[in-house]
Amino acid sequence: MNCVYYKSSEKMQEIPDGSVDLIITSPPYFNVKDYSKDGYQVERHSSVDKADLGSYSTYEEYISALLVVWKECERVLAPNGKLCINVPLMPMIKRSYCTHYNRDIFDIQSSIQQSILKNTKLFLLDLYIWNRTNSSKKLMFGSYPYPRNFYAQNTTEFITVYVKDGRPKNTPKDIKEASSLTQEEWLLFTKQIWDIPIPNKNDLAFGKHSAIMPEEIPYRCIKLFSCIDDIVLDPFTGSGTTLKVAKSLGRNYIGYELYENYRQVIDEKLNSVKRGELLDKK
């Protein structure tokens, strides 16, 4: 507990059955991001790990490989535990189809949802839409400026919440009170559209990791779905954002990260906060 394992999360034998209260993660993108390179996707810091789920040759293999992790998440989740998965729509260039269009949309959220609901006993609890309020200036032009084949700008992502069946554990009254949300937080966090900017240069991982999760996403999920001293897991730790926020909210954390090159930035993030320092934010 309160550690990071630098290995694949396909087998999380370090974690006992039914011991994790909340899982928050964003899985590797399919054939879009190279996690063996820096945040600018220029300098390579290591070879591509053979267990990198984002490097599979077909989309079907990618979704199947992710399911192995989701089944492990189901195993380690406590009764009434939540699994929060953040993914975007993924525009892909068509290279192998003889069509008039040169791109296709991979609806990763839908594919993962179907895979989980068909192959596990988890239930779909909620779906939030992350509206990236300061999206990239890299525009998708399509047939611009002429009609018929405009491409929508990719400015949203999804946070899908699954729940494991069962009664929640008994939580002492003082812990429940200390973990409570303000009325303002409750009203804001339960809206299905979350207006949150993407991370900028103020994030310690900027330029070091190519897919940084904004701290506000795990902050809201942790406040909504866990109490102080609960265990929060991220099976695709990346730059360590989820773990940092969990620590600052007085939760325990466990992370799995395939690329050890990210150890330094993960340690920097974890060392930049004190346990429970955000509990006085409300």
Which residues make up each language-model segment?
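Short, conserved SAM-binding/catalytic segment
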Residues: 248, 267-281
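Core catalytic lobe of class I
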Residues: 1-265
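Short, flexible loop/turn segments with low-complexity composition
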Residues: 173-177, 277-282
